[in-house]
Amino acid sequence: MEEIQRYLQPDRSQQHNFLYPLIFQEYIYALAHDHGLNRNRSILLENPGYNNKLSFLIVKRLITRMYQQNHFLISTNDSNKNSFLGCNKSLYSQMISEGFAFIVEIPFSLRLISSLSSFEGKKIFKSHNLRSIHSTFPFLEDNFSHLNYVLDILIPYPVHLEILVQTLRYWVKDASSLHLLRFFLHEYWNLNSLITSKKPGYSFSKKNQRFFFFLYNSYVYECESTFVFLRNQSSHLRSTSFGALLERIYFYGKIERLVEVFAKDFQVTLWLFKDPFMHYVRYQGKSILASKGTFLLMNKWKFYLVNFWQCHFSLCFHTGRIHINQLSNHSRDFMGYLSSVRLNPSMVRSQMLENSFLINNAIKKFDTLVPIIPLIGSLAKANFCTVLGHPISKPVWSDLSDSDIIDRFGRICRNLFHYYSGSSKKKTLYRIKYILRLSCARTLARKHKSTVRTFLKRSGSELLEEFLTSEEQVLSLTFPRASSSLWGVYRSRIWYLDIFCINDLANYQ
C-alpha cells in the first residue's frame, strides 16, 4: 500500500523549480553547446549538431534583447516583422531552444540523482554498457525464444502541441518556463518541421534536434510510466477500475479512492492482463510487446492500448498501427536486423539396453539476419553500387588522395561489419564487402585513368588489408595458421557494447 501511495504522490522536491531565470545566463549556452566540456557528460542526449555560428558576442546580444523585451510575442500573420527575433530569427530561435532544452533537463537529472542516492549501502548497477544498441539483443535472445506472440506497435506522435506542454507541466512547475515552451512550439507549429514521417519509423528534423528529442522522450515517458503502473497493478483491479486512471489530469486526485479500492479484498479478481512473461522494448518510434500468452490475450492488450492513447492523449489512434504476429512465423525489422524466432530441429538417438529410439526435438532459437535488400538500397543511394548491387565508382571522391579514398571505403566496411557482427549468417556481409572493395578499386582506377585490372595488379594485396574487419584482424593475429574449423568462429554472433548509433553510409559525402 505504501508503494502505491509513493508512486501516485508527486515528488514534492520538484514542486518549485524556477528555471526561467537560467535562460538569461551565459554559461547555460556554453553548457548547451558543450564548450570546454566532455561531450559524453551530457545528461540525457548528446548534442548531435554543433553550430559554429555560436559566439559569446551573439549570446550577449540575445540576452540583452530578452532583457529589453517585456514579453515573448509572435505574430502568426506577419512573423517576419517580429521585432524581437529580427533578421537573425532562425539563429536566435535555435540558440534559445538549445539552451531551453538544457535547462528543462535539470528536473530530470535531479530526479535521477535522488533515485541513485536511495541506493546507499547497496551496489549501484553500472548502466554504461546498456547505452549500446547491441545490449538489447542479448536480452531478446534470452527471453523472446520462449514467447509466442508479439505486438508490433507504431507509437503515435502528439498531433497537438499543447499535449507536449501538459506532459512537461508535471515536472516543471515554473509557469514562465512553460509559456516560453509554448512560444517555441508555436514558432515551429507545423509538425512537418518537427517530425519527418516518410517511413514507418519516423525521425526528427535536424534543426533543433536535441530540443525536440527531449520533448518526444518526455512524451513517451509519460505514456510508459502510466502504462507500466497500470500493468503492474492490473491484477488487483476490476475490469472497469483502470479506465478512470487514464486521465492524467486527475491522476493524483484519485489517491484516496485508490487506497480504498486496493484495501478491499475482491472476491472476484480480473486476471485478463496477468502475464508474468510480458516483455516490452521500445526503439526508433516503435515498440514491441511480447508475451507467452494466447492470441486472445494479445488482442485484449491491443484494444487496451488503443483506448489508452485515445483517452489519455486525445489521439485518433486506430488499430491498424498495432499488429499481432506470431514469433515463429514472422520476421521483423528491428534496429537494422531481420529478427525472428525459428524452430531448430535436431535428432537425438537414445539407447536403452537393446532398444534404440530416435527423438525429434525442435528448439526455438532467436535468429538475426542482415537485411540485404535495404542495405544494398542504402549503398545505391550513397552511389556505391546500382540498385541491383553492381559496384560503381564514386566520382565525388576522385579528387582525394589514394590513402583517403581507401580509408573512407575501409571505414565504412569496418563499421558495417562491426554493427552487423551479431548476424547469424555472415555471407551477406561478405557480399557487401565485395561491393565496397570493388567500388573502391573503380574509384581509384577512375582517378588514375586506368582499368580496374591494371590497378589491382599494381596495388597487390595492400587494398585487401584495408578492408579487414576488426574481428578478422583479431582472428588473424590469434590464429596465424587458420584452418577450416575457424569458419565456425566467423559464423558466431558477437555483440558489442560500444555502439551508440547507426552510422550513416553517406556520412562522408
Swiss-Prot record:
InterPro entries registered for this protein in UniProt: Domain_X, Maturase_MatK, Maturase_MatK_N
Gene Ontology cellular component annotations, sorted alphabetically: chloroplast
One annotated GO molecular function: RNA binding
This protein's record includes keyword Chloroplast: yes
Record's keyword terms, sorted: Chloroplast, mRNA processing, Plastid, RNA-binding, tRNA processing
Subcellular location: Plastid, Chloroplast
Example GO biological process: tRNA processing
Family: Belongs to the intron maturase 2 family. MatK subfamily.
Role noted for this protein: Usually encoded in the trnK tRNA gene intron. Probably assists in splicing its own and other chloroplast group II introns.
Protein name from the UniProt record: Maturase K
Lineage: Eukaryota, Viridiplantae, Streptophyta, Embryophyta, Tracheophyta
Encoding gene (name): matK
